[in-house]
A protein has these predicted regions:
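Short hydrophobic/aromatic-enriched beta-strand-loop microsegments
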Residues: 51-59
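Long, compositionally biased intrinsically disordered terminal regions
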Residues: 60-65
């Protein structure tokens, strides 16, 4: 038997409902069972509730037992319980299209989905518990992986503060440095070209400058200008070193310096990371 309690979007009303569950959720002695329970810990934390007590995460349990397999609930239910769950896409639509939110779905359907979710999670917990014991994984699971969930959840919730002023200054400095490098590369190459185009870089290095007679080509017929290839040819022409320096600064600028400020949460003013304990092992 499972129960579903709708929680309204309005914060004050939601707080009133969650207040009834707070003592149980914050009880340090009661076991909390979940599938990817870190997600649930973070959801209620936003409402001022800090879940406490021992945990049993069915996703992590399965990861320890079979790290090379998938760990989603739908897969686990079909594989170990021989049960086909209601897929969330059946309620809110496929990812390829504009999805609904669960608040857009009739409460009767949401209740059935949520109740099934809880029921399946409990059944999976009962299935995996003896498996962990049989494989000698109890200490790793209960003493390391489960406490780690609280640590990771706290790290994600706390977030990271960025010095946006310093990043902006670094962005300006790197942009200036890239423009200078661009001019130097054109002078060394004896022509202008798109430095960010691997195809054009290959044509300049191997057709125009002819720094390598037997240059390697990709399946598409273009010259390979990977970092590994260019490093081997660094001593053959000064433009190669400049190209490598340009690429390094360009990646630093686009991937970190300019990108990180865009990831700041407007509500907290911080970047909030996400840590995965169940990365598929290959």
């Amino acid at each position: 038997e499972a129960w579903y309690v709708p929680v309204p979007a309005a914060r004050e009303e939601a707080d009133k409902i969650l207040a009834h569950f707070s003592p149980a959720l914050q009880n340090p002695k009661s076991l909390k069972i979940g599938q990817n329970i870190k997600f649930d810990i973070l959801v209620v934390r936003k409402y001022g509730i800090r879940i406490a007590g021992p945990l049993f995460d069915t996703m992590i349990a399965h990861y320890l037992l079979n790290p090379e397999l998938r760990h989603g609930m739908d897969y686990l239910a079909e594989t170990y319980l021989k049960y086909k769950t209601v897929r969330i896409e059946e309620l809110i639509g496929p990812r390829e299209r504009k999805q609904l939110t669960m608040r857009d779905v009739p409460v009767v359907q949401v209740a059935e989905y949520a109740a099934e979710d809880a029921d399946i999670t409990l059944k999976l917990k009962n299935y995996f518990t003896p498996c962990l014991e049989k494989e000698g994984l109890e200490s790793l699971f209960y003493d390391i992986e489960m406490p780690l969930i609280y640590v990771l959840a706290e790290m994600e919730y706390t977030g990271v503060t960025l010095d946006t002023v310093a990043l902006k200054q670094s962005s300006e400095e790197l942009t200036t440095a890239l423009k200078k490098l661009e001019k130097e590369i054109y002078e060394l190459a004896g022509m202008k070209f798109n430095i960010n185009s691997a195809r054009q870089v290959g044509e300049v290095l191997f057709d125009h400058l002819k720094i390598e007679e037997k240059a390697r080509k990709t399946k598409t017929g273009s010259y390979s200008t990977s970092e590994e290839i260019l490093e081997k040819m660094r001593s053959k022409h000064p433009v190669v070193g400049k190209l490598l320096e340009y690429r390094g600064l360009k990646k630093l600028l686009s991937t970190y310096i300019d990108a990180l400020p865009e990831l700041i949460n407007p509500e907290t003013g911080k970047i909030h990371t996400s840590y995965n304990q169940a990365v598929t092992s290959t």
